[in-house]
């Protein structure tokens, strides 16, 4: 993808932004193709326990034996988001996404956001997340690649910042050196449409300008 885009638009810098599920895929992409990029922004990420991810992957494989890989399991879906709304119960099941209730309601009303993944999709996702626990895989990431981690300190995906810090530490342990991180007080998961989204955009812009100078 990067090679093709560079053919169409040569001579310009390339930065990758990965948010939420995309942040996990972005981290994998950086290990394989980070040498093609000038930097990356990792937003709303986390670092789930390896044993839990392995269990979820095994469960998907077992369920597929009986239902097929295209089966959409509510159980696996609920397990994947278990506990995210803890402490916010009462209004919707997804208030963990955002302090802006209107944005949460827009999300819930959009069928492109609320469909259930197939077992195959979950299996692939869990397989990818497991790669991020492999030090040899992480060591493939360019050591000096500029990285910016952004998250809300009330985002359950990143365990209120603790999972974000574990993700960063895993990269530092692999020798990746050029990492910055900012946690936004009170912010939840969807930073680009959170109540402080203007601050987030300004921080992204400032970071990009610094690395384009």
List each language-model region with its residue ranges.
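Conserved acidic catalytic loop of the alpha/beta-hydrolase fold
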Residues: 1-12
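Gly/Ala-rich beta-loop-alpha elbow adjacent to hydrolase catalytic centers
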Residues: 17-22, 26
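Alpha/beta-hydrolase-fold enzymes
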Residues: 26-112
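Active-site nucleophile elbow and catalytic-triad environment of alpha/beta-hydrolase enzymes
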Residues: 118-139
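Short, proline-enriched alpha-helix->beta-strand connector loops that line the catalytic pocket
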Residues: 141-147, 177
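Short beta-strand/loop motif that positions the catalytic acidic residue
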Residues: 149-151
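Conserved alpha/beta-hydrolase "acid-adjacent" motif
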Residues: 156-166
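Catalytic active-site module of serine/aspartate enzymes centered on a nucleophile-bearing elbow/loop
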Residues: 174, 178-213
